[in-house]
Design a protein with these regions (language model features):
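P-loop NTPase Walker
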Residues: 1-149
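Conserved phosphate/pyrophosphate-binding and hydrolysis machinery centered on Walker-type P-loop NTPases
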Residues: 55, 154-161
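Conserved AAA+ ATPase "sensor/coupling" helix adjacent to the nucleotide-binding pocket
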Residues: 69-72, 167-174
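Conserved small/polar residues in nucleotide/adenosyl-binding loops
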Residues: 179-181
Length: 181
């Protein structure tokens, strides 16, 4: 089954969970950064950056994603500011088609409110949940520790293989030790 190509400006922004799944090198990071731009700038009720949850697999991927989201928001803000200025500015040479289409959809006179939303998203980007699966689970447990019946210093197990090895070792010693007594 062949799927149609992903269109970053065509994905519905209705409330709910979205999964973007693709092979390595297919543009997932680019697509996610553009979707974040759309989520904080479009619709009747654009989201605040801290309302988003963006989850990936590795710390490096999460850091790269945060950086690419920041760059995408900066690109869009620069385009809006240029469009708000006098004259008809020439588009930058590195303007990609999804961003050009997004800008065209904003109309001939993008609002100052839209620029303000993007500026606020950039200023508050450090509050965004752009993390790994492990980081998301850790934060969720910490935020919900009391409701889950856990202490405030709850932590996820990082060395699971080592811990299993220690348990097997301890069990083995107890069983062998009993057999020789």
């Amino acid at each position: 089954m062949t799927l149609p190509p992903f269109e970053p400006n065509g994905m519905p922004l209705s409330p709910g969970i979205r999964l973007l799944e693709a092979s390595a090198g297919t543009g997932k990071t680019f697509a996610l950064a553009h979707l974040v731009l759309r989520l904080v700038s479009e619709g009747q009720r654009p989201l605040a950056i801290e309302q988003l949850l963006v989850v990936t697999f590795t710390d490096a991927a999460a850091a790269e994603l945060r950086d690419r989201i920041a760059r995408r928001l900066q690109q869009a803000l620069a385009l809006l500011e240029a469009a708000a200025g006098p004259g008809d500015p020439a588009p930058p040479a590195d303007l990609d088609q999804p961003l050009a289409d997004w800008l065209a959809a904003q109309g001939p006179n993008p609002s100052a409110q839209l620029r303000g939303r993007l500026l606020l998203a950039l200023e508050q980007l450090d509050r965004a949940d752009i993390t790994t699966i492990h980081g998301f689970c850790r934060r969720t447990l910490q935020r919900q520790a009391l409701e889950a019946g856990l202490g405030p210093a709850v932590a996820l197990e990082n060395g699971a293989a080592e811990r299993r090895g220690q348990i097997v070792h301890d069990y083995w010693q107890q069983q062998i030790g009993r057999a020789h007594v």
